[in-house]
């Protein structure tokens, strides 16, 4: 099964780059990506057109008329060409088995929902400035949770 990963974003290219790097590390690699931008920023357009990743990316935008995330998500859902959708926010770095696990539990007429782990400011900044630290993230999280 091939999913489409829809990423809802608003101007934060640093976080989107971290998401893309986490997508490059996925154990399941056959997926499409739609970046659903609630707005139309030059920085986002330049970032997406100036970088290449190992998966196809479709960038959808709309006018920045205040918070209108749901409208751009509806456009992204309509633009998808696959049978399974995974929708995430533009500040969620993914575990390397994120797509694999979604597909393992995917079934017709089923909706999967999950929660994210909200990181403190220090850990968030570390992930955004040194992406290699994500490899050690599970161990760091356990240390803080136990």
Name each model-derived stretch.
Residues 2-4, 32:
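Cell-envelope/extracellular polymer assembly enzymes that use nucleotide-activated donors
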Residues 97-130:
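Conserved donor NDP-sugar-binding/catalytic core segment of glycosyltransferases
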Residues 85:
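Short aromatic/hydrophobic "clamp" motif used to bind/position activated sugar donors
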Residues 63-80, 97:
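Glycine-rich, basic loop-to-helix element that forms the pyrophosphate-binding segment
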Residues 37-46, 53, 92:
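A conserved acidic beta->alpha catalytic loop
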Residues 11, 23, 37-40, 64, ...:
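Conserved short acidic donor-positioning loop in nucleotide-sugar-dependent glycosyltransferases
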Residues 30-40, 58-62:
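Short beta-strand/loop segment that forms part of the nucleotide-sugar
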Residues 21-30:
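Short, acidic, metal-binding catalytic loop of nucleotide-sugar glycosyltransferases
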């Amino acid at each position: 099964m091939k999913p489409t990963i829809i990423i809802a974003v608003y101007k934060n290219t640093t976080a989107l780059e971290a998401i893309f790097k986490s997508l490059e590390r996925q154990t399941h690699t056959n997926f499409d990506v739609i970046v659903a931008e609630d707005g139309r920023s030059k920085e986002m357009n330049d970032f997406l057109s100036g970088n290449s990743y190992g998966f196809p990316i479709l960038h959808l935008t709309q006018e920045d008329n205040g918070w209108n995330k749901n409208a751009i998500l509806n456009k992204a859902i309509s633009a998808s060409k696959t049978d399974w959708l995974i929708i995430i926010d533009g500040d969620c770095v993914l575990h390397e088995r994120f797509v694999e696990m979604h597909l393992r539990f995917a079934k017709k007429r089923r909706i999967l929902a999950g929660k994210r782990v909200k990181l403190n400011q220090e850990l968030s900044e570390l992930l955004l400035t040194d992406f290699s630290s994500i490899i050690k993230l599970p161990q760091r999280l356990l240390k803080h949770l136990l």
